[in-house]
Amino acid sequence: MFSHYRYKENSCQKREAIPDKSRVSLTFLQKRTDSSNVTVAVAVAVPIGAIIIVLSVVLIVVYRRCKKEPSMQDFDPNFEGDLYYLPKMDSSMNSANSDSNATEKRFIYGGYDDFLQPSIENSQSFKDYVRRINEHAPSAYNIASLASQNNSKLSVPSKHIDLSNKISFESLENSELIVSPQHSNTGQDCDQRCDSTSNPDVNEKSSHNNDNRLKSNYTSRSGLEPQCSREEEENIDRIRSIYNIYFEKSNSTIRSSVTSSIRRDSKLNIATRKSVNMSSQDNPNDTTLIEQSHFGSTTVQEIDSSSSANEEYEDATDYLQVPAPQENKNIASSVYSEVATREKVIPESSLSLTFPPPNGLSTRITSSIYSDTVAKDHIHSAKAPVRALSEGSGQSNLTSAQQYSTYFIDHCNQSNDDNYYYNYPLPLEHPQNYENIGDLPTPTQFIYSTSSHSLTSFKGRPKPPKTLKHVPTARLNGTALNPMDHPEMFYSSPTKIPSTSLTKQFCTPLPYQLRQSVVMTNPSELSMKPRYKPAGSLRNLIKAQYLPGNSSTTTSSSLSQPPSTLSNAINFRVSGLLDDTDILQPPSVGEILPFKASTEDLRKQLGTSHNYEITPYENVHV
């Protein structure tokens, strides 16, 4: 009982204290309304001030660091940059009282050594390079001019030809050339080159000479180029040995073709000389043949003399070059040389372009494993006039750099047009004759194959159609050749199949036949009888029976009926399905929807439609 009364007293005290707290809180809120502006200002200003202070500190640090970096780079021993400036040009080149080499100094530009290159190990080498850059040394212009002069002397032979260079007509009969003493070394080099194909000892000597030549060229250039390290020299020697081995292997495969071509060319030259001799004996007064022979002999000798000078700059790749045909005696620089003032055109009957026989040896070295046989169907005989320079006042002072390429043909074979060919590139046409599937090697044999195969270039098991013209494919050791290298051996002209045979006997069209047709599919194959029944109702069947054109159902009784009874018999509905007449719209209705899209117009149109009628019979079934 006592605790119960005490609880009541405490509850009364709490209830009495509640209004006092509400009064205190109200008074407190009313007092702090005056100081709210100060708190807002402090809350905004303090963060902004802190952010400004932090940003200013960061900017000061960055500015000091950027200002400190250039000073550190100036004293950095390992810094490599564009801070070193080249010194000024030599003042002596602009002075009036200069020595005899003033013109040379004008092109030296201060005597900078363009071939002096600093190493990139440290900055000290670059500083030494800057100190030594004022030392007088041959400039790039002078070196290039000297090199161009040497090349011009080697490429263009001298215009002064001695009388010993001329070849008499008697020397043609003995097939001997009179060589001047100053070019006597040229004949020896040519003899060594011709004999090297048959004598293996000479081949070894020539290869040794090529190695010595490479070494001499390398040592001669070593004065201008920086010294190589031992590792670089070892790499160079290793590469040189690899190339020598490759050249020795290639020499063994090319010797036979080179020797045969040299022999064939020599036989042709002897035949032409004999023919010229015979014709000159028949016509002693005719000097045109003598001039032509004399003109050709001087051309041969001049090219031999120029070849000796160019031989110094040849490398070990001489063995990879196939000798050009004997008829064309024109050097590379003759295209841009001087043109003679006096010319004459040799008639077509005396000159024509020749082409090697179809069964000749291969002239391709990079892909020597393939045969370059030329089909007779793709060769057309042609003739073209060839320009030759006339000789003036009985002296042949013409050089090979001033004349066009001349062709000398045997006059005994002028009437035989089958011996003269001109290689016109003809367009290749489809279809392509593929190899048999039996020639397709196994996957393990692809590694050891000498030619690249295409898996799509093999035809399938079924035999090809008889209309295709079969061309025998070239093979090497039972391996079919690649059509990319010899397309003329794999492609032939398409055969035209008459349209009557295609209509009578159906066959699968070939890809090139599909391109010739406008329609890719045969329309006759699409005309198949339908196996489905057309959609409709019993009304369509009855209408078809009562049509006047149907003779099987038209009788005298049906024709005697009035049209009203026929229309009533046709218009009755069998089911609630829509018919064709339900879809059709009579012309009196007009548009399907009204022009004004209002609900009243739409209701009026739906209520007055002519094709919607409800009968009690249809209502029951629907």
Swiss-Prot record:
Its main location: membrane. Phosphorylated by CDC28. Residues 181-201 have a biased composition (Polar residues). Residues 202-214 have a biased composition (Basic and acidic residues). It is found in: Cell membrane; Bud membrane. One of its GO terms (cellular component) is cellular bud. It comes from the Eukaryota. GO terms for biological process: maintenance of protein location in cell; negative regulation of mitotic cytokinesis. It is a single-pass membrane protein. Residues 181-233 are annotated as: Disordered. The chain crosses the membrane at residues 42-62. Seems to be involved in the anchoring of CDC24 to the membrane of polarized growth sites. Present with 56 molecules/cell in log phase SD medium. Belongs to the SKG6/TOS2 family. This is Protein TOS2. The gene is TOS2.
